Amino acid sequence: ANYHFILNGITTIQNGASATTSRSTLNDGDTITAELTLVSGCVVSATVTLIENIVTAGTISPVNQSICSGATPTIITGVTTPTVNPLANVSHYWQASTDGFATFNNIMSNTENYQHPTGITTTTQFRRVDVSELNGQTCSDTTVPVTVSVNAPPVGNLLVNGTAQASITICTGDTPIFTITGGVASNSYTFRINTGVVTHTNTPSFDPVALGYVFAPGVTYSVDATIYNKPLVAGNPDPTACTNNTSSITIITEATP
C-alpha cells in the first residue's frame, strides 16, 4: 500500500509506505488530504480542514493603581473581550503576583471583572487569563497586568518637650510643646486633645497653649496626632493621603502650689 499526504491539494508532504507523517508549520484553514492506494490499485482518500484555536487576550482597566497600605484596590474591569474563533467557548480566570509573575496564584474563575475582597500591604499585579475551548482543544492568553502600588504609611514619633514618654505631669500655666520626629517635609498633621481636633498643620509641632488651649488643674488629658503623607488642601487633610496615627501622651495637670 502507498500513502500520499497532500497539503492544500498541491504540496506533497509524504508519498510512500509510511501511514504517518508530520509537518512543523501549518496554518488556520489548511487542508490535509490522505490518499491510500492499495496493491489492487484501488484508491481511497479523506480530507481534514485544520482550524486554529486562536485567542488574543482582551484588555482590562485601570492601567495602574496607587493605594495606601491595607486599602482595598478598586475594581478591575474588562474593557474588551478576547479575540477568538466564533465557534469557541470562552471563559476567564484571574491571577495575582507580587514578583512580576515569576510566581502567581489563581484567584477567581470565569469573571470578566475582578474585585479584590480585602486590603493589601504589598505591591501586587493582577491579570486576567482568557481561555478559548474549541473542539476539545484549550488555549489561553493573558492580559497586560494591572499594577496596584502600595504606599507605605508615613512614620513619626510624638514627643513632648523633646522627649518620648507615655505621660508627663505639668503645673498650671506650663506650656507643653509637642513635636513629631521622623517625618518628611511633605507631610501634614492633625493634633488632637481628648480625641477632639485642635489643629491641622503642615508643620510637625504643636503648641496648644499658643492656640488658646487651657490645661485645667486636676484634669488628665490625652494628646495624639495623625500623620498624612501629603500637605494640607485648603487647610484640611488631603482625602487621598495615606495616614498613620501616633501613640498618645497623657498630660496630668497639677495646680501650682
Residues covered by each model-derived region:
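A short beta-strand segment in extracellular, disulfide-stabilized domains
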Residues: 1, 71-83, 172-182
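Surface-exposed, flexible coil segments in extracellular/virion-facing regions
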Residues: 4-24, 95-119, 195-211
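Short, exposed coil/turn segments at beta-strand boundaries within extracellular/luminal domains
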Residues: 39-45, 134-142, 230-246
